[in-house]
Amino acid sequence: MDNKTYEISSAEWEFMNIIWMKKYASANNIIEEIQMQKDWSPKTIRTLITRLYKKGFIDRKKDNKIFQYYSLVEESDIKYKTSKNFINKVYKGGFNSLVLNFVEKEDLSQDEIEELRNILNKK
């Protein structure tokens, strides 16, 4: 899967978080889970499932006449590649610019500053 296909919508993130948490889930399980958080129709959720299936993020297997959906991508991989795409798009690939933007605009606690220092020192 190339980097461009790693762009997913907020709604698709909702779905993927459920799949990563449950490992396997039927469409009805997914619908129930999403409807506890969002006011989406079952048809909308089924469309979302189909879209992610066609994009190659999920696959399905038949279990007693019911499709069980599961992720084809690791959560950490998609988060990394999505973040990388964002940095390339918004910051022209400059990770330094991203960090500087947040450090300058956010009020960081001493603990957060120390944590950043420790991370950088390990590199």
Swiss-Prot record:
DNA-binding region: 7-71
Record has Transcription regulation as a keyword: yes
Family to which this protein belongs: Belongs to the BlaI transcriptional regulatory family.
Gene Ontology cellular component annotations, sorted alphabetically: cytoplasm
Site label Cleavage, positions: N101, F102
Gene Ontology BP, a term: response to antibiotic
Chain coiled-coil ranges: none
Signal sequence, start to end: none
GO molecular function terms noted in the UniProt entry: DNA binding
SUPFAM superfamilies: Winged helix' DNA-binding domain
Keyword Cell membrane listed: no
UniProt KW keywords: Antibiotic resistance, Cytoplasm, DNA-binding, Repressor, Transcription, Transcription regulation
Main localization category: cytoplasm
Identification of the protein by name: Methicillin resistance regulatory protein MecI
Top-level lineage group: Bacteria
Quaternary structure (record): Monomer and homodimer.
Biological function: Transcriptional repressor that constitutively blocks the transcription of the gene for the penicillin-binding protein MecA. Binds DNA as a dimer.
Processing after translation: Upon exposure to beta-lactams, proteolytic cleavage at a single site impairs dimerization and abolishes repressor activity.
Database matches in InterPro entries: BlaI_family, WH-like_DNA-bd_sf, WH_DNA-bd_sf
